[in-house]
């Protein structure tokens, strides 16, 4: 063993985390971004492929990665700076959504992250580019990340963005990191824009989601499920009552989100919003056991016990023909390799490669997880 390799092994052994169950020799939990950068620099020097792990809730999305080393964020789980008057909070990547939302209740605030994933980590949600159902009202997660820090593949800690709330719709590193699946490095602390929880909220069960969406004024979400369609409303009591009356249907107080499911196979149709109804038909034609359709957003997530290759190929071809894609979000690795996690690479794939090369020139960070083998 070379001196460099021996030093790397000592570094990784010092930070070993035995609590994370993944199939690789080294699992390490740095306590700071500087330690993470040191690990990544050492991994680059000896040519080790690195994967990243938060709570493991999004590990089955993307092409399978054969990693020599896994870096976890379990030891970086602090709420660093909470400024409720400024509507911002800075958190480390290992903080779970449940922990974050619990800390915001004292001032009736929310980070508007996925509502049904309390065990997911902030870093994992950002890396996977996940947004909650309230995206219809508040926009995607990337629009609420004001500032972000990452440890790059070349072993440096970099920060981008601005702590000023008005910069939340700008461009830069926060947007590059969102949905990057760790291909640019380990996502660390992020500064999030917060929103006030509505004073009143209601869930309205309706017959036709699209018709109800056109009647509702700025609903939080409009969802179709295997059982019914629901409109989610938030605002003052007067606003909510008026909308409930205008929409009709059966209403209840509060936000009754769909129960999360954990099927052996989960697919996500990501299509222009006008094709949601057609995507629901495509999902059902594949014998979905459950589904949630996000009207006005263009996402239909569906669970399956099994699927045929021909049926899947036809569904993916349809999704791509209308300008979308069909993503395998959960499945055994061998099936994901057979079906292909993403489908056809996007037109921006070469630009993505250039960005990857800037942050991770040795290509060690989650190699091959993204479309086109990035």
Per-region residue spans from a language model:
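N-terminal glycine-rich flavin-associated loop
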Residues: 17-51, 73-116, 130-163, 199-205
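Conserved glycine-rich FAD pyrophosphate-binding loop
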Residues: 61-68, 74, 117, 156, ...
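A generic structural motif
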Residues: 226-238, 297-305
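Short amphipathic alpha-helix segments
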Residues: 4-12, 203-222, 241-247, 270-288, ...
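FAD-binding subdomain of flavoenzyme oxidoreductases
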Residues: 106, 111-114, 118-221, 225-230
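Terminal amphipathic helices with adjacent charged low-complexity linkers/tails
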Residues: 232-253
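N-terminal accessory segments
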Residues: 1-26, 42-57, 315-343
